[in-house]
Design a protein with these regions (language model features):
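Charge-dense polyanion-binding interfaces
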Residues: 466-483
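Short glycine-rich or small-residue beta-strand-to-loop segments that form or flank ligand, phosphate
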Residues: 59, 86-88, 166-169, 327, ...
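N-terminal "arm"/small-domain region of PLP-dependent enzymes with the aminotransferase-like
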Residues: 1-67
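Conserved N-terminal alpha-helix of the aminotransferase class I/II PLP-enzyme fold
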Residues: 49-91
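A short N-terminal beta->alpha junction/helix N-cap motif
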Residues: 2-3, 60-64, 258, 283, ...
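Conserved PLP-enzyme active-site core in the AAT-like
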Residues: 8-16, 20, 40-43, 79-82, ...
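Structural signal for conserved beta-strand scaffold positions within catalytic alpha/beta enzyme cores
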Residues: 87, 133-135, 224, 354, ...
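Conserved C-terminal alpha-helix-loop-beta "cap" of PLP-dependent enzymes
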Residues: 294, 300-469
Length: 483
């Protein structure tokens, strides 16, 4: 990384120059620097609304960058150790889908864990690729799926030598890391591309002593959520590619679905955040890791909770653990994770990332302070004292291995009918069902609906999980294939 070049922020600098010129706008957006919508200015501020501008020659164009955006992407590639980088304004969802659409066509096989984000499975609906699932092991106590074991990947490749790609979560939402370097070496030896979903792994590129990043492991493409742990605005992301990937073709794929009206608020936030991480990321993420470790120790000293970390590492299904993650098991105090999540928000004004059936996740990043950690620890101690109960009747287990009947694309576009959830047992799902967050589908199109899955959906609803994916907003009915 050229640290001197990293002091530049070309999109931000171009916007600063643009502001000085007092250009009269006869283009979009129609609020005309906020003059047409004073309430927007009141909410967001004059400076923010004044920078919500359209693509123009001095500001470049994201669909075909030739100047400041191109330079910003080159700086991002240098900072992340990639051959090329693409600034994304459709979230990491669009980056994940661009990876898959760039490597797979209709009928192609892709090897992936089933505990992927819905964006990956949505990409299979779009392109018609066939999933070959490597079903990860479960941690029976925590109820979470683990990483992809190298032996599982080897078996999947042996049985599907014509696969085009392997997709790896690095890390999972809960912080679990696979042996990425070995997976990359194995796949490449068979001529198969490796894609990494690093929605929760921006910090891996800049922190010392953290798990290995996708590009460092030799992956071909990586989708990186700068807005999650990198400090940019929500919805901004970066797609990274290695030297053996045709960057021009990837740009064409991105432009199939990405907006032609890219937000310069998002683009400049990516530019500024990349500079910040390149110059100060190592120091910042060292503090994040320290805060997370302190929180783990304090929470575990309360009793009843289990804030897990590298103590889980076993060298296979948990090859490493992302120590910045603060994942906490709650069932031993008699409360589901979603119940603790709701209590923290409703009674203590603390908003954490998510709560599921067994766990909660508090996202620790460069914007957190030690006093915020103390407040969280105090609230968890209070919740245990005031709300803990007998754990009888609580369901454990966060992931159920699916049985695939037809491809996601075929199922999604098939004729379907609506049936009540428990009456759908034995049918093939025609839609997604998931708790969001984390956005890992309980059911995907083309999968067999078992009694266990149906009961899990009902239980998750009863516990207050936010359910998504179904046509029925109440999630009382499921769309299933007619035949």
């Amino acid at each position: 990384m050229d640290i001197n070049r990293q002091e530049r922020a070309p999109i931000y600098e171009a916007l600063e120059e643009f502001k000085k010129k007092r250009v009269v706008p006869f283009d979009v957006p129609g609020h005309k620097r906020g003059r047409g919508n004073p309430e927007l200015v009141h909410l967001l501020g004059e400076k923010c609304v004044g920078l919500d501008v359209n693509s123009m020659k001095p500001l470049d164009n994201l669909c075909h960058p030739v100047s400041v955006i191109r330079e910003a992407e080159e700086l991002a590639a240098d900072a992340f150790g990639a051959a090329n980088a693409f600034l994304m304004v459709g979230g990491t969802t669009s980056a994940v889908q661009a990876m898959i659409l760039s490597t797979c066509k209709a009928g192609d096989k892709i090897i992936l864990p089933r505990n992927v984000h819905k964006s990956a499975l949505n990409a299979l609906v779009l392109c018609g690729a066939i999933p070959v699932y490597v079903n990860p092991q479960m941690n029976a106590k925590l109820g979470i799926s683990l990483g992809m074991e190298i032996d599982q990947v080897a078996r999947a490749i042996e049985e599907n030598p014509d696969a085009k790609a392997v997709l790896v979560n690095n890390p999972t939402y809960y912080g679990i890391c696979s042996d990425l370097r070995s997976i990359v070496a194995l796949a490449h030896s068979k001529g198969i591309k490796v894609l990494t979903d690093e929605a929760h792994g921006t910090h891996l590129y800049f922190g010392k002593g953290l798990s290995i990043s996708g590009m460092a492991a030799g992956a071909d493409m990586s989708a990186v959520s700068m807005h999650k742990s990198g400090g940019s605005l929500t919805q901004s992301s970066i797609l990274l590619t290695g030297r053996d990937v045709n960057a021009d073709y990837v740009r064409q794929i991105i432009n199939l679905t990405q907006t032609t009206s890219a937000s310069y608020l998002l683009l400049s936030s990516l530019d500024i955040s990349r500079r910040n991480l390149a110059l100060r990321g190592e120091e910042s993420f060292a503090k994040v890791a320290q805060m997370s470790e302190y929180a783990r120790q304090e929470i575990n000293s309360i009793g009843g909770y289990y804030a897990y970390g590298r103590d889980l590492v076993n060298g296979t299904s948990i090859y490493d653990y992302d120590v910045t993650k603060l994942s906490i098991y709650t069932l031993d105090i008699g409360l589901a994770g979603i119940e603790v999540y709701d209590l923290l928000r409703d009674e203590y004004d603390i908003q954490i990332e998510f709560g599921d059936i067994c766990n909660i996740l508090a996202y620790i990043s460069i914007g957190d302070r030690i006093q915020d950690i103390e407040r969280l620890v105090g609230a968890l101690e209070d919740i245990k004292r005031l709300y803990s109960k007998d754990k009888t009747g609580l369901l454990s287990g966060e992931y159920i291995n699916p049985k695939v009947a037809v491809s996601p694309q075929e199922a999604f576009y098939s004729q379907k009918k609506s049936v009540r959830i428990m009456d759908a047992v034995g049918a093939v799902s025609g839609e997604f069902v998931m708790c969001y967050p984390p956005g890992i589908p309980i059911l995907a199109p083309g999968e067999l609906i078992t009694k266990e899955i149906a009961q899990y959906i009902v239980y998750a609803k009863e516990k207050g999980c936010s359910m998504q994916g179904t046509e029925d907003p109440a999630v009382e009915y499921l769309k299933v294939l007619e035949q």
